[in-house]
Design a protein with these regions (language model features):
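Primarily recognizes the serine-hydrolase "nucleophile elbow" in alpha/beta-hydrolase
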Residues: 122-183
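The serine-hydrolase catalytic nucleophile loop
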Residues: 69-81, 200
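N-terminal cap/lid segment of alpha/beta-hydrolase-fold proteins
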Residues: 28-55
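Conserved alpha/beta-hydrolase
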Residues: 83-104
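Short beta-strand element of the alpha/beta-hydrolase
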Residues: 60-68
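Short beta-strand/loop motif that positions the catalytic acidic residue
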Residues: 182, 188-190
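Catalytic histidine neighborhood in serine/cysteine hydrolases
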Residues: 208-225
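Alpha/beta-hydrolase active-site loop
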Residues: 75, 108-130
Length: 254
């Protein structure tokens, strides 16, 4: 779906951050973690993050799920269970400073949105060390922006999916220098009525990125992982399933 002409670059204003964060729900811890394993891993700057592994330990394809704010990894648990049932090894984790509780413990450090790419890089490297040879990144809101930044310049990320990722948030920015260096297959998903303007950002990401890529603007007001539980949830989940099956989990993966 096309959009009107994109306005100029988004200003780095506190109001932009507050509007974006207020549009994100806190995420529910009610989702089952049956069959998953709590783990932790360090970042390059020495912060230990809390996470959880879902899916078969011998899977050759994996997925890292990066959460939106002010939610935590529990917002991804339903999708993690769904992907695990499809045969993927899935890692959810909490960005530094986030603590949903439970047997997984808390991520260390102070909350810092600008450290999201550092945290996600550590999560990606951890999952690859766990066994999967092909690992995709899926991020909601700021997790999506971080996913684009982490995938840029790396040849070991065959697929990236963003749900309502902003182009700019505080000091994080996914501009042309980032987007043109992502070799993996990119799927940008956003709701047309998202009050944070995610549809405009998704169109921008699509316009600036090389192939393979796809833009999906759905008729919804939901933001981030809320797209998976909203009126377009089944459609969004199917988009993710097909993208991963096409670019991450080919029969010849080994």
């Amino acid at each position: 779906m096309g959009l009107p002409n994109r306005p100029g670059p988004l200003p780095l204003l506190a109001v932009t951050v507050s509007v974006l964060l207020s549009s994100c729900s806190a995420g529910s811890s009610a989702a089952s973690t049956s069959g998953s394993t709590p783990i932790s891993f360090p970042t390059s700057d020495g912060v230990r993050l809390s996470g959880r592994l879902f899916g078969p330990a011998d899977a050759v394809a994996g997925v890292v799920l990066a959460h939106m704010l002010p939610a935590d990894q529990t917002s991804w648990f339903p999708e993690a269970a769904h992907l695990a049932a499809a045969g993927y090894r899935v890692l959810t984790f909490d960005l530094r400073g986030y603590c949903p509780g439970g047997d997984g413990g808390c991520s260390e450090g102070q909350k810092d949105v600008n450290a999201a790419p550092t945290d996600l890089t550590a999560a990606l490297d951890f999952l690859r060390s766990d066994g999967p040879t092909r690992v995709a990144l899926i991020g909601a809101s700021v997790g999506g922006t971080a996913a684009l930044m982490v995938a840029s310049g790396r040849q070991d990320v065959p697929a990236v999916i963003t749900l309502s990722a902003p182009e700019v948030l505080d000091r994080l920015a996914a501009g042309p220098d980032i987007l043109t260096n992502i070799s993996g297959a990119k799927l940008f998903i956003a709701g047309l009525g998202d009050p944070a303007g995610a549809a405009t950002s998704a169109q921008y990401f699509y316009d600036q990125s090389p192939q393979p890529k796809r833009l999906e603007i759905v008729t919804a007001d939901d933001h981030g992982t809320d797209l998976l539980s909203g009126s377009q949830g089944s459609h969004v989940e199917q988009l993710i399933d097909v993208w991963l099956a096409t670019y991450l989990h080919p029969a010849e993966a080994s």
